[in-house]
């Protein structure tokens, strides 16, 4: 397992560290933990996995070492 930092793309601040196999699964874990409603999309952008929601929130998963 690797550790991924979930970054708020609006403020560019790290929110949490999530252990996962890849960035997509880290964002899925983050979504299940913190986002209870709304529509969302997880896609790859510039080599990083990004989660965007209908509320205008954008998060990305970056592998930490």
Where are these regions (language model features)?
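Short aromatic-glycine-(Arg/Gly/Cys) micro-motifs in beta-strand/loop hairpins
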Residues: 1-14
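Generic structural signal for short, flexible, solvent-exposed coil/loop and linker residues
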Residues: 6-9, 23, 48
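A short local loop/turn or secondary-structure capping micro-motif enriched for an aromatic residue
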Residues: 23-26, 59
């Amino acid at each position: 397992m690797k550790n991924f930092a979930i970054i708020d793309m609006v403020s560019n601040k790290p929110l949490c560290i999530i252990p996962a196999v890849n960035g997509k699964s880290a964002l899925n874990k983050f979504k299940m933990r913190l986002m209870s409603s709304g529509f969302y999309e997880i896609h790859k952008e510039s080599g990083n996995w990004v989660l965007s929601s209908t509320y205008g929130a954008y998060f990305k998963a970056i592998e930490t070492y």
